[in-house]
């Protein structure tokens, strides 16, 4: 045997494994069988950590129940700590994220890596599985069908905590701009038509509150992930486990993760059902819808600058055209739009894969995992990208904003309590026909005085409309 290889054996025969590899023959075959993408399990450190946490919890439970030798359990626990605390072997998970087998390749990859780390800690060589075996010891009282989804759930839950932090930081960025723009009057619009005045601060605060609602929704649905089927083994009957194992393993998992994990009410149902993933990714889709809408608004509000709304200025980040000089585009809102489109597409993937299970197992969980990890990852990055490269640098064109208000026919709505709806119709029609302002027409018709208009159209009143009429002209008067 060469110093560069070691021989390992499985159901299908013997294979040469690189001597320095911590993975084994099962992982090697998975590498050879699945070459779909350039994305590996190693590229998702949260997933690796989630799987290792499951293995640590299982080893702790097995140690307490004496289902494996104490020295072996201690070696597995120590191997898990090497990965969790020191990042050891995070590059030893080379299996493609797209894979058949319901996650068996990921589970065995984890078993092999931990077994070989444990063997070294015990003073043995990699591959000397007679002392510490990937199946008989690391995978004791487990099946891929409970270990894999439990590790996946822990990993997604951990990732969602980071996403929530990113959303909150973005929300705070909008809130800061809301305060900065609180006294800037602008025209509100419905159906892209002038409606009634508001402040730019109110518009940005609405963005902030919108994101606050999404945080609550994500946190609420994320709790579904903490109901796990650890101890279910193959189909949920708990085959080859002591009756005490499942609740004890889940208790140990809660200790290892720091999350309030609980056993599923029915392990057979939990092993076959993927409804929690549909719910959680649905929350991600809802966030994507809201973020995309915000970016649409930012692009529209900054449009122009000469022939658009031009109410706000986005930071100028790069030249916008290879042919048109001096053109700058809203590239960050555009990329966030695209992120949101991808997340919405991933939601369809999760939905179809969750529906595709048969009988006691859904073998499509790997693609659910790929979609969910990708969605959480790109949404997290999008929040920071939008905050740092766009929101923090937004400035307002106060004169433009206020000019739209005072030149708009829409502000005649504010005069309804003072001049009546019918007179408002007449004023609006004259403004549209002549191009005159509402103020000009109202004064010409003697409906209100300069002083009254100054009071009604003050920033304070437009921000907080007072409906108690100081003067009212009956609609019958002409």
Swiss-Prot record:
This is Aspartate ammonia-lyase. It comes from the Bacteria. InterPro entries: ApsA, Aspartate_Ammonia-Lyase, Fumarase/histidase_N, Fumarase_C_C, Fumarate_lyase_CS, Fumarate_lyase_fam, Fumarate_lyase_N, L-Aspartase-like. SUPFAM superfamilies: L-aspartase-like (SSF48557). It is an enzyme of class 4 (lyase). One of its GO terms (biological process) is tricarboxylic acid cycle. Contains three domains, which are composed almost completely of alpha helices. The active site is located in a region that contains side chains from three different subunits. The divalent metal ion binds at the activator site and not at the enzyme active site. It comes from Escherichia coli (strain K12).
């Amino acid at each position: 045997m060469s110093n560069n290889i070691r021989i390992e054996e499985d159901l299908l025969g013997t294979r040469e494994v690189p001597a320095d590899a911590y993975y084994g023959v099962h992982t090697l075959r998975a590498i050879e069988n699945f070459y779909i993408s350039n994305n590996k399990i190693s590229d998702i450190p949260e997933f690796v950590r989630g799987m290792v946490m499951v293995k640590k919890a299982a080893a702790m439970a097995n140690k307490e129940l004496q289902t494996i030798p104490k020295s072996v359990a201690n070696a597995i626990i120590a191997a898990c700590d090497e990965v969790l605390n020191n990042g050891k072997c995070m590059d030893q998970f080379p299996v493609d994220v797209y894979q058949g087998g319901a996650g068996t390749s990921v589970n065995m990859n984890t078993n092999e890596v931990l077994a070989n780390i444990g063997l070294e800690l015990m003073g043995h060589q990699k591959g000397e599985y007679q002392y510490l075996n990937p199946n008989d010891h690391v995978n004791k009282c487990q099946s891929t069908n409970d270990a894999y989804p439990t590790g996946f759930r822990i990993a997604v839950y951990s990732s969602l905590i980071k996403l929530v932090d990113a959303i909150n930081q973005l929300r705070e960025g909008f809130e800061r701009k809301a305060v900065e723009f609180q006294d800037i009057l602008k025209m509100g619009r419905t159906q892209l038509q002038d409606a009634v005045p508001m402040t730019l601060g109110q518009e940005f605060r609405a963005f902030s509150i919108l994101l606050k609602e999404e945080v609550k929704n994500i946190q609420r649905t994320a709790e579904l992930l903490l109901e796990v089927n650890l101890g279910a083994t193959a189909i949920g009957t708990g085959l080859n486990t002591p009756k005490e194992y499942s609740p004890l393993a889940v208790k140990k998992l809660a200790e290892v993760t720091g999350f309030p994990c609980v056993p599923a009410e029915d392990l057979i149902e939990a092993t076959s059902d993927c409804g929690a993933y549909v719910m959680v990714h649905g929350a991600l889709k809802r966030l994507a819808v809201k973020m995309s809408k915000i970016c649409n608004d930012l692009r529209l509000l900054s449009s122009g600058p000469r022939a658009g709304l031009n109410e706000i200025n986005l930071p100028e980040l790069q030249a916008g055209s290879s042919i048109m000089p001096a053109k700058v585009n809203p590239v960050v809102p555009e990329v966030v739009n695209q992120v949101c489109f991808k997340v919405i597409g991933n939601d369809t993937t999760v939905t179809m894969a969750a529906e595709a299970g048969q009988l006691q197992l859904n073998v499509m969980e790997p693609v659910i995992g790929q979609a969910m990890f990708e969605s959480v990852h790109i949404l997290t990055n999008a929040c920071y990208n939008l905050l740092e490269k766009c929101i923090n640098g937004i400035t307002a064109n106060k004169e433009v904003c206020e000019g739209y208000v005072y030149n708009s026919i829409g502000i005649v709505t504010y005069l309804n309590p003072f001049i009546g709806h019918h007179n408002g119709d007449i004023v609006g029609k004259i403004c549209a026909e002549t191009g005159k302002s509402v103020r000009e027409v109202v004064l010409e018709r003697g409906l209100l005085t300069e002083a009254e208009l100054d009071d009604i159209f003050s920033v304070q009143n437009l921000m907080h409309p007072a409906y108690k009429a100081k003067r009212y002209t009956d609609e019958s008067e002409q």
